[in-house]
Amino acid sequence: METSLGTITKAIAGAKRIFLDTAIVIYYVEQHPTYAPLLNPLFELDDIEVDFVLSPITLAEALIVPIRLNDWDAYHKLADFMLNAPRTAFILIGSEAAKLAAEFRARYNLALTDAFQIAVAITAGCDAFLTNDKGLRRVSELSVLVLDDLCMSEANGC
């Protein structure tokens, strides 16, 4: 049986910079019982040489539920991870990413937030985009890794 470490490291092999979509951040920070065991090795092992990229969209999306619930502990944990975690870059959205987002919105009919996330990943030089959104698989400009697909490659699922 393959371990979570084996599955995740195999999936990211060769990647030096990975964009983290919103769900991935939430699953890790909140230690989602299904997905955290697969994600933990990415963030907790020193021998994985990869940097992570986040955008203002990731930050805004992740903070909506804690704000609605007045859960300031969750709010601060999420914000602290996204803004201060080691090997993590918070990339602002510039005009190049905005133009690219428009192209992706038109080409793939993505939601504008998804188009922006993909555009930031590309302009930030990411090799891969880690998400749990199966609809983003159709983007061909970079490697889209869907967490549920990685779970399916585990012997017992996630």
Positions of predicted regions on the chain:
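Conserved glycosyltransferase catalytic-site signature
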Residues: T22, P56, D114-I118
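Short, well-structured N-terminal submotif of metal-dependent ribonuclease cores
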Residues: M1-L54, I67-H76, K134, C151-C158
